[in-house]
Amino acid sequence: MEDLQLVLFVLGAIAIVAVLVHGFWSIRRQQPKSLKDSPMGNFYKKQAEKGESIPKRIDAEGFDADGIGAVRVRKAGELAPNNETPTANPYLKQEVKLETKPQELTSPEFKAELKQGLKPELKVEAKHEPIPAQPDFSLQPPVAKEQHRGPKVSRQEPVLGTQVPQMGQSHAAIVAQKAAEQEQALRAAPQQSALFEENEHQADHQEEAFVEQAAEDELGEPRDVLVLHVVAKDGQQLNGAELLPCFLTLNFKYGDMNIFHRHVDNAGNGKVLFSIANMLKPGVFDPDNMEQFSTQGVVFFMTLPCYGDALMNFSIMLNSARQLAEEIDAVVLDGQRLPWGEFTKQDYLHRIRANA
């Protein structure tokens, strides 16, 4: 077993060394050869040792393959030939100036050469041409121009520095004035529409109040009362904790006389259609203490005549009583505390038609 471990250790070390050697060899192989190692580098080195100059191919203009021409040495203070005049062409050939020794900036030769180099200058004369007339982009139609026709006047091109004619100024003033008027009209439009809507809403509210007041005057004193009882079964009572959620689900709202009312609007607005009271005296509810409240039954009652359609209101009251009885496991009775039936329903409908 120990021999096997030793063999494996040796093989692993050999493999690691082989991987390292192969990695170094790959890196060495991928590196570019330097100029010294290249064949051309040896060629240039041998030529330099022998003292021989490397032949260069020069074209007809005096430039070699690298674009370098012959070196021209110019002495300090030497003037340029007369045929060499500076021009504005940026593509002129530039000559390399080699000096034997650096010049001082304060030397007289440098100043003379600087003056000679600054003498030729390019003078560009600015030629002012008349600016062409711009087309008229005004939004006004050409009707106004046709109405004020007059003698034809030759149109002159505007010159730089001249003033704009007075007619253009008046036209721009008219356009600005009309734009300001339109902006004022647009600003005033929402205010006028809001004022109109407010007046319209006030008129609608006044009309509704007038209709309601007229309906109250027409109803007069109640002539009959339709009553339905929702009573607990024998030996049981109705708990307030169960009654209150049912009242709210049936869209009843606590209000006048400390009882719950069903209004024209499900949100509790408008006239009262019918109401719910406690069957036991004093017949009121206390919403803050409904959890401690219990009773034997509740009473649904609707006065005749009533607001709206009496048949529809009675149908809603009957359905509400049945839903409440089903939710709390109670019984629906009529005004005489007798079981509700078809005969009692026909009697109630006859009473509604008689007081319509």
From Swiss-Prot:
GO terms, biological process: division septum assembly; FtsZ-dependent cytokinesis
UniProt membrane topology term: Single-pass type I membrane protein
GO cellular component, as recorded: cell division site; plasma membrane
Keyword Transferase: no
Any Pfam family matching the protein: ZipA_C
Predominant location category: membrane
Functional note: Essential cell division protein that stabilizes the FtsZ protofilaments by cross-linking them and that serves as a cytoplasmic membrane anchor for the Z ring. Also required for the recruitment to the septal ring of downstream cell division proteins.
Family: Belongs to the ZipA family.
Assembly description: Interacts with FtsZ via their C-terminal domains.
Identification of the protein by name: Cell division protein ZipA
